[in-house]
Each structure stands twice: as C-alpha cells, then as structure tokens.
Amino acid sequence: MKVLIVGGGGREHAIAWKISQSPKVEKLYCAPGNAGIAKVAECVDIGVMDFEKLVAFAGEQAIDLVVVGPDDPLAAGAVDAFENAGIRVFGPRKNAAILEASKAFSKDLMKKYNIPSAAYETFDSPEAALAYLETAPMPIVLKADGLALGKGVLICSTREEAKEGVKTLMLDKQFGSAGDRIVIEEFMTGREVSVLSFVDGKTIKIMTSAQDHKRAKDGDQGLNTGGMGTFSPSPFYTDEVDAFCRKYVYQPTVDAMKAEGREFKGIIFFGLMLTESGPKVLEYNARFGDPETQVVLPRMKNDIVDVFEACVDGTLDQIELEFEDNAAVCVVLASDGYPEHYDKGYKIDGLDRFDGQDGYYVFHAGSRFDKDGNIVTNGGRVLGVTAKGNTLKEARENAYKATEWVEFGNKYMRNDIGKAIDEVGVVM
C-alpha cells in the first residue's frame, strides 16, 4: 500500500521510520518532510496547511492511507478534507481535534463528565480575568485557550506575575488569537506523566508512559519549549495509577467525546499530574507528542500500520499492543538560543554514525538539504537522539553517549534529561 504522512518534524520522522518497517507498505511519502525523513520516505514540497494540494496529491498518487502528524492541520480540519475526498486517513476530525484545540472545551468536558482535573475558570475579557486574580490563591496557572506550540501555559507564583501573564496572553497577543480566551486554573503539584493512546471512536488502547522536559535549561529553568527530551516508561506511572486512569480518565474521555457527538479516532495523548489526591488531567493532545513519540515508537513491537487501520475501521478491540520490556531516552539537540532567537543553516556532521547501530536512533526535527546536498540545521529543535537500554539509567547513558556522535555550529542540549530517574526509590 501507499502511505502519505503530513508533517515534517521529529515526531513525523519517528512515525515514518516506524511505518517504513511495515511489510504492507510499498511506497511512503511525507509532506513536507525533512532531511532525515528523506532517508525513509519521498518528501513532497507541500505545506501541512495546504489541504487542497495535499488532497490532490493523495488522489493523484492513489494513496491508501494518510497519517496527519501535527496539531495545527488537525484542528483546522485536515482529516475532514481527506475524508470528504474519499481518502482513508488516520487522525481526529476537526470536531474531535477540539479536545486539544480549545483548552476551555476540554476543561468543560472534564467538568461535565467528572474526569479528574484542576479547578478552573474561563475568561473572554482581560478585565474579568484581572478582577478574578485579585482574590485568587497563588501560585496559579494561565493557559491560552487555543494552540500555541505547547508554549501557551504560564505558571505564575505571584499576583503581579499573573496579571502580567493576562496582559501577555490577552492584550499583547503573544500567541495571537489563541489568547482571545484564557483558562485560569489552580496550580497542582506532583509528578507529570504523559500517556499515549490509540482510539477508534469507542475503544482505547494505551501505549506506554513517558515523561517530557519542557523547560529550555537544566534544572527545569528557562522558558517553556516544545520539549527538550523525554524518557519512557515513567517509573512513577505505577499499576495503581494505570488502574485508576483506565477507570476514571481514559475510557471516560472517549465515551464523553462520543456522547457529545464528537467521536474521536486517532491518538489521544494524556498529560497527567500525579497529585497527592490522585492522578488528574493537565491537558489533552489530539496527536502524537513530540518528543514522546521518539521514545515510545522504538519500544513498540506491533506493525503500526495495522494499528492505524484498526483505528480508522473501528476494530481496535481486536489489536493487542505490545511493547518491549526495556527503556528509552531521547535528548533533543537544539539551536543555541531556542526557543527565542537562534541561527540556522549550520552543517550537521556525524549522522552516519547511527547507521546500523542497533538501539540508537537520530530523529530529525529541524533539518534540510542545502544546495550542495549537505544536511544543515533548519529550526529551533534540530535532532532528537534516542537510545534504548535494559533500564532507564542505561538508556540515558547510551543517549548522552550518542549525542557526542553529531556536531553542528550552535548545538545546545540539556544535560539533565531523565534526572527524575535517580529520584525513584526502586531501581528500574
């Protein structure tokens, strides 16, 4: 069969790498792709939001399955566009992708269906938000309602900071229309865990847990980013947590969306906070996480195309997901200065060191070919270096060793990805 992936980041490279291993797939395309994806797929120069061209291309090439990676096209109706043209596509329709595209929608859904989450209020006017902050307990969390590249969440320790945050989101429009409406919610403490799942509209199958590192600098300092590294599984995601979430979070979310007439097919990524009073939902994403995908898919044993098709066909109940009994760590190599100002166009050396290295992977997030055919940097997050190991500590050691194999002019990384592994009472 012929498959088209929409996207061009590290997440899509991991998906493309996984799809390329399926014996079912004879031809793989990716639009727009990147220099790493070009190793496993034919890259097509069409932007992720250019639905007309994407649908036309899929029609011309007789594509059997489309996989939409990023949140923006999903929220804007990419799946609807392919479906309307009679093309099989994996991902949620626009009316279901709202689960991620509107924080206010997801909070209201959780409240209505008693899915555990932080207490919150929603505001459309900065004046009302500021008035509310006069008496609200600190610290507090502000969230832009719309999509903001994973950066639209502000944790404010003081009232002054919170008021400044309202100004940033609603008046200065740092994230554009995403901040027209904001959610203000109570600050929760605990361990954060990400859990990825496949959904076919009624059945949900949990993949495995992971833990992201959002801040740009070591020690969880600096600005929020799209993610600087991750590990899987999370040692804090215990059997007790899993049992609780299956009963009160996972299936109830799928059932709630169905009850609202917004049947969800695709990936639901649950951002959880493990609080003293039990697990609570921090956020939903309606797609694979980035860089979580880069540690989850290398551990997955299934043919991913089988799972994609089962989600599209509503037969996910017949699939048993299987994961290796090991661990993986991904360290993101970024351009120095990310997520603010950084230079691009540096030549990347050493990528061939990963060829034939079992258990070591380099997933390209921001790379392209220059006019001489060299692979150069082309984004804030450039590469995700993933390594597996029998334990989390071994995987972490392997991942950091592999970061030394590649070089580019302004290479930057966090040196403490997976530090929480050392904080676990039990040896993984």
What are these regions (language model features)?
Residues M1-K94:
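ATP-binding N-terminal substructure of ATP-dependent carboxylate-amine bond-forming enzymes
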Residues S20-Q21, G36-A38, E60, F90, ...:
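Solvent-exposed alpha-helices and their adjacent loops that cap or buttress functional pockets
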Residues C43-M49, E121-S125, C156:
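Short acidic-hydrophobic, aromatic-tinged amphipathic segments that line or gate anion-handling sites
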Residues F90-G152:
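A conserved helix-loop-beta module that forms one wall/lid of the active-site cleft
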Residues V153-T293:
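Internal nucleotide-binding/catalytic subdomain
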Residues R246-I268, N285-Q357, D370:
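Active-site "cap" helix and flanking loop/linker of ATP-utilizing ligase/carboxylase catalytic domains
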Residues S367-D372, V376-M428:
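Generic C-terminus detector
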